């Protein structure tokens, strides 16, 4: 317990304060939000910050298209709105992105899977392939998001309630984080009333 825990720091000091210095490796970190509560937006913001800080970021999306995730992360990196990003001409965009690339060594890889079709076995294969074929080793992995992944060891059926199924996915993601010695960030959906629960 005297060993210093290795962490991936946030760019925002507030998050470093509440996490004691950033995301610990080998952990599953879950953002809790109601439907349309900004789960993907927050994860894209964090992903952009980690990339800008020189970290290799793997963003796995089971909901939005790769292109939409890339747009959100680019807007965060360039510190512009989505509207401004879409109206930016190609030469201005290229100039800004080349400047960013010269300032940071962090890389970003985005992978899209069909909703409810991908599980940790797919993610494990992806990480291994990226390491072997592209020499890309992630420092942090984002999974967007927990409730719409699949379990690698449990089939969803009428006899299994959704809580048990999502719990199994969370356990598998935590094992994935431990296996690859990285923090995994995901999100889960709650009802608007559930976010006010005294259990949280």
Each model region followed by its residue ranges:
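Phosphate-binding/switch loop-helix module in NTP-utilizing enzymes
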Residues: 109-176
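Substrate-engagement module of ASCE P-loop NTPases
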Residues: 51-52, 163-190
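Core recognition of P-loop NTPase motor domains used across DNA-transaction enzymes
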Residues: 1-25, 100-108
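The Walker A (P-loop) glycine that initiates the GxxxxGKT/S ATP-binding motif of P-loop NTPases
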Residues: 32-33
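Hydrophobic positions on the alpha1 helix immediately C-terminal to the Walker A/P-loop
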Residues: 42, 46, 69
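Pre-Walker A (Motif I) flank of P-loop NTPase domains
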Residues: 24-29, 55
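Conserved glycine(s) of the Walker
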Residues: 38
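Cytosolic-facing regulatory segments adjacent to core modules
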Residues: 19, 52-137, 199
């Amino acid at each position: 317990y005297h060993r210093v825990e290795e962490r991936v720091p946030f760019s925002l000091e507030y998050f470093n304060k509440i996490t004691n210095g950033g995301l610990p490796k080998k952990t599953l970190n879950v953002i809790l939000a109601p439907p349309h509560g900004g789960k993907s937006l927050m994860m894209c913001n964090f992903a952009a910050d980690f990339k800008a800080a020189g970290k290799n970021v793997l963003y796995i999306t089971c909901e939005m298209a790769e292109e939409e995730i890339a747009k959100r992360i680019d807007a965060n990196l360039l510190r512009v709105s989505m509207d401004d990003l879409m109206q930016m001409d190609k030469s201005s965009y290229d100039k800004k992105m080349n400047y960013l690339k010269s300032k940071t060594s962090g890389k970003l890889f985005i992978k899209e899977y069909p909703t409810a079709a991908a599980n940790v076995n797919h993610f494990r294969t992806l990480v291994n392939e990226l390491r072997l074929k592209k020499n890309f080793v992630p420092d942090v992995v984002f999974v967007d998001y927990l409730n719409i992944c699949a379990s690698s060891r449990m089939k969803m059926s009428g006899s299994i309630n959704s809580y048990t199924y999502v719990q199994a996915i969370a356990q598998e993601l935590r094992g994935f984080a431990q296996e690859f010695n990285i923090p995994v960030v995901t999100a889960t959906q709650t009802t608007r009333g559930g976010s006010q629960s005294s259990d949280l």
